[in-house]
A protein has these predicted regions:
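DNA breakage-rejoining catalytic core of tyrosine-based enzymes
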Residues: 98-116, 175-187
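N-terminal core-binding DNA-recognition domain of tyrosine recombinases/integrases
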Residues: 3-20, 26-105, 121-124
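Basic, Lys/Arg- and aromatic-enriched nucleic-acid-binding interface segment
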Residues: 113-145
């Protein structure tokens, strides 16, 4: 199988971020295979376990698990032998998790007090207005950076009784772009309108 053609075939079916992650993980694995003259798409479980153990010398368990999950998907989609489901591979990952596993660091949540302090130090010019809008938008919608960047002015909706909402066109959990309506405050609605008039 031509791996370049394979990754090209994923376009439109998977998000750009997923394809980028698959490609990066595969290249790391493929380079390792090349070093030992292994066929990346026809490898047995013992050799794949060696790859995992070598990753364990420098990478976190979370990164290793993500790479193994990516490679498992690639093996399945290319109809190749999938060593990731073999007991020896599963046990190798379990050993690494027991030996090196640490709880993943969670991002510090943006509380209302922190939000207020951040907005208070924003300047009164157009840059400050933009920063206030982004802070309020992130706080209220709890969206990823990539999702926040997709919002458009026409996504702002006004309903009866002074209610406002934003249309979220796409998210990681909405791969088929069905969209989702997110209620927002008067404050965020006013910031969006102010920004639209300022630019």
């Amino acid at each position: 199988m031509n791996i370049k053609i394979f990754f090209k075939s994923l376009e439109g079916a998977y998000s750009e971020n997923t394809i980028r992650s698959y490609r990066s993980d595969y290249m790391h694995y493929s380079n390792w295979c090349q070093k030992y003259n292994y066929d990346p798409l026809n490898i047995n479980e013992d050799k794949f376990s060696d790859y995992i153990l070598q990753m364990g010398e420098s990478l976190t368990v979370a990164t290793i698990q993500r790479r193994v999950a990516s490679l498992s998907s690639i093996f399945n989609l290319t109809k190749s032998t999938n060593p990731t489901k073999e007991p020896v591979v599963i046990l190798t990952i379990k050993r690494l998790r027991r030996k090196f596993g640490k709880p993943q660091k969670q991002a510090t949540p943006l509380t209302y007090d922190i939000l207020t302090k951040l907005k208070n130090v924003c300047s009164d010019d157009i840059v400050g207005l933009r920063n206030k809008l982004l802070l309020q938008l992130g706080y209220e919608t709890m969206r990823r950076r990539s999702e926040i960047c997709q919002f458009r002015f026409e996504d702002l909706q006004h309903h009866g009784n002074h209610k406002h909402a934003l249309l979220l066109r796409h998210s990681k959990t909405d791969q088929y772009n069905q969209g989702k309506i997110i209620p927002i405050s008067d404050e965020l609605s006013e910031l969006i309108l102010s920004w639209s008039l300022a630019i």
